[in-house]
Amino acid sequence: PPQIQVYTRHPPENGKPNILNCYVSQFHPPHIEIEILKNGKKIPEIEMSDLSFSKDWSFYILAHTEITPTESDTFACRVKHVSLNEPKTVIW
């Protein structure tokens, strides 16, 4: 099943714009759905890297979006894939 890592490009500081990355790897077949959530709601505009594959033919992809974290906001990455019984959510 897919491995999911959620991290920011720069050290997070409340009120400072940042990029939230959701790196998903070790999945096969290549079809996958990735959402970035803010307070449980899908962020509509996210960027996706090209789908790539590793030496072992598993796939990986990076989804990212600009965020401005605050104390009260929660961000997460939700992944839907055929190898998962239900969507997997990882909170940042």
Curated annotation (Swiss-Prot):
Signal peptide: none annotated. Pfam families: C1-set. Keywords: Disulfide bond, Immunity, Immunoglobulin domain, MHC I, Secreted. Disulfide bonds join 22-77. It is found in: Secreted. The keyword Chaperone does not apply. Belongs to the beta-2-microglobulin family. Heterodimer of an alpha chain and a beta chain. Beta-2-microglobulin is the beta-chain of major histocompatibility complex class I molecules. PANTHER family: BETA-2-MICROGLOBULIN, MHC CLASS II-RELATED. Component of the class I major histocompatibility complex (MHC). Involved in the presentation of peptide antigens to the immune system. This is Beta-2-microglobulin. The gene is B2m.
